[in-house]
Amino acid sequence: MGNWAVNEGLSIFVILVWLGLNVFLFINYYKVYDDGPKYNYTRKLLGSALALARAPAACLNFNCMLILLPVCRNLLSFLRGSSACCSTRIRRQLDRNLTFHKMVAWMIALHTAIHTIAHLFNVEWCVNARVGISDRYSIALSDIGDNENEEYLNFAREKIKNPEGGLYVAVTRLAGITGIVITLCLILIITSSTKTIRRSYFEVFWYTHHLFVIFFIGLAIHGAERIVRGQTAESLEEHNLDICADKIEEWGKIKECPVPKFAGNPPMTWKWIVGPMFLYLCERLVRFWRSQQKVVITKVVTHPFKTIELQMKKKGFKMEVGQYIFVKCPKVSKLEWHPFTLTSAPEEDFFSIHIRIVGDWTEGLFNACGCDKQEFQDAWKLPKIAVDGPFGTASEDVFSYEVVMLVGAGIGVTPFASILKSVWYKYCDNATSLKLKKIYFYWLCRDTHAFEWFADLLQLLETQMQERNNANFLSYNIYLTGWDESQANHFAVHHDEEKDVITGLKQKTLYGRPNWDNEFKTIASEHPNTTIGVFLCGPEALAETLSKQSISNSESGPRGVHFIFNKENF
């Protein structure tokens, strides 16, 4: 198993704390509504569905408070910057923000289902009591406060002639209307967040996610009508439950048992969510302010395999390696923002991104930049671009290790372009304070053309390290995962040439996929008693493989080899 705690210990601790708080809130509120004297008569009317509705409501408040925080990108970047003195293992938790966001969303979905189903039973019990087909106790409780301005218990205020009137009661009350609206919003948000829709129909995902505005407004006013009611404190003092609970016929007739009075709980949800909503509002204001700052496209480069490079300048823009930005092109869409990893280095006087053309928005940007035309495009014809960021990622920590493994799959190589460029600049400037001593770089790609735009950078690094007698600083392995028979024959013919036929590098391209178990064991033997950073930008399947290898090849004890796995998430 290796040292599992090295990679996952803190993450599991955070998750257990979160789950523990959910369990605590559920049990605590369940006991209040299932055992508390305040809700004794409410339980007589509604049964166990009362507690089963209110306990998940408390958990919903808690999780709806949390759901916005992981997507406050500027807040996370601030925390990452302010925690620079902390352990990389602590900062890694910030890089799992989207994973936590999804977990909280599923928890909200679970408690919404329980809350909704329980309240459907509550509506039925209330309506049955008003219709007169319930037990006499429930009917008597429902008759309390039938007149105006009296302190009633049953929210179904008028006697219903139609026994099927439950639906009517539900959809004519504020709680019912808002409950239906926010549940529909939640269903649309979750169903449009599947991997297939995010990748193939990002616009659908983006627009439906903004239903969260309606969701939170509905959530804030959901309890304003106070339909879940309990006995007032004054009534509990006057109306002794031990004496009066079984003497319903004598209520109001004997001094010891006055008619009980009821009141609804004041709305609480807004108190839970007002703080995160304010933070998120500030987040959006910062994003809007940044989006209004002028961005100049200085160069557009068309690379093979339908990839374009945008080089841009923006006043006051400062970046670190591996960071990402959000880009909006009003000519393509006035509302949509899309994330892209920065491929430039902090030492350069511009910032750049590489964009693979795979969807409607990227196709629109490709055409707006004139990349679909053969002739040269004048700078004044280039579209206006808005940029929000940069935002921090796990790759910022790459210089915190002496040894790192960088693994990129396809276009996922982009964050490592920034890192390798920065390394090259640091060596050009004779940087002596560089902690990083060894880079193992792996690039997996299925098409030969995809290597072309990155080969120049690797050649520069290869030459630079040889000139400085430090050729061992960078070990890179490029894997071609897709080829046909004619390509294989061509590669075989040119195998003995000094430079690789695909990349033009001295290091030959490998075919197939790495044997990760061998790679990790070899690196572990080369660097005993070392903490090694493993950085991935690639698919989930590869992330799972590398995470398992990092755990299984890490040794127990503080002086052993430790592989710390990091994955890009945005």
UniProtKB/Swiss-Prot annotation:
One of its GO terms (molecular function) is heme binding. Its cofactor is FAD. Residues 2-9, 73-95, 195-203, 286-570 are cytoplasmic. Keywords: Cell membrane, Electron transport, FAD, Flavoprotein, Glycoprotein, Heme, Ion channel, Ion transport, Iron, Isopeptide bond, Membrane, Metal-binding, NADP, Oxidoreductase, Phosphoprotein, Transmembrane, Transmembrane helix, Transport, Ubl conjugation, Voltage-gated channel. PROSITE patterns: FAD_FR. Heme b 2 binds at residues 115, 222, 226-227, 268. It is a multi-pass membrane protein. Residues 287-397 form the FAD-binding FR-type domain. This is NADPH oxidase 2. It comes from Mus musculus (Mouse).
